[in-house]
Amino acid sequence: KKFYLRRENAMIIDNVYIYTPDKKFVKGGIILKGEQIQAVYEAKDTPKFEEEVFDGNGAYAIPGLIDLHFHGCKGDDFCDGTKEAIGRIAEYEASIGVTAIAPATMTLPVEELEHILEVAAEYKKENTDKRRADLLGINMEGPFISPAKKGAQDERNIIPCNVEICERFLKASDGLVKFIGIAPEESEEAIDFIKSVKGKVNVSLAHTNADYKTAKAAFEAGANHAVHLYNAMPPFSHRAPGVV
């Protein structure tokens, strides 16, 4: 199937369902130039092209997804601490429509986490492979969490939130750490911690047993995210809403 319209060096993908800003799928096509979407069109307005047209066979076309919390895939874990593992993770994610990632760490010893973060920073600087999802950031799930809600995290490595250690993480990652989880009830210094680092990293409530009052104070201090809401936190009830 061919259409004809002078549009130099463009790629046209026709016969797809495009996810639009009004949250609807509309049948049409996409015109790409270089790495950018130049235009989209509805099927009823299909122009004529002189370039080759690729038939999308009725596939759904959506913006690239961003995964902010996962630990690995296809046998590789972000905490393997190798550039090769990160590369394989990023390539697989891109193959399923995820174009940017912020993989999560586990609760490990501080020095081990620093090494993992350093490796990620090196990978970020060196990677040029367009087939891979962009390493947008890192989501630190611990070590500043609650033993009572540790889940699969290793309790031996759990410590209270600490500004100096957080700064070490930020330095090791060259600023790539974008989220850091804390259990605010585990330290009297939690509010000061949040106020100290909130301009450098997003503070999450994660693996926490905080009650409503403690969680509210943390959010008012600058925390802005909750990790896997409802999971690894107190159950929601009308008398004790907790973090939720």
Predicted regions and their residues:
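N-terminal metal-binding scaffold of metallo-dependent hydrolase/deaminase domains
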Residues: 4-47
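Divalent metal-dependent hydrolysis catalytic cores, especially in the metallo-beta-lactamase
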Residues: 71, 87-116, 132-146, 173-185, ...
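Active-site mouth loops of central-metabolism enzymes
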Residues: 72-83, 152-159, 202-206
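Charged helix-capping and loop-helix junction motifs
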Residues: 82-85, 116-119, 162-163, 239-244
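Generic structural signal for well-ordered alpha-helices
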Residues: 90, 114-121, 166-170, 194, ...
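Conserved phosphate-binding/catalytic loop of the ribokinase/pfkB sugar-kinase fold
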Residues: 146-171
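Active-site core of metal-dependent hydrolases
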Residues: 171-244
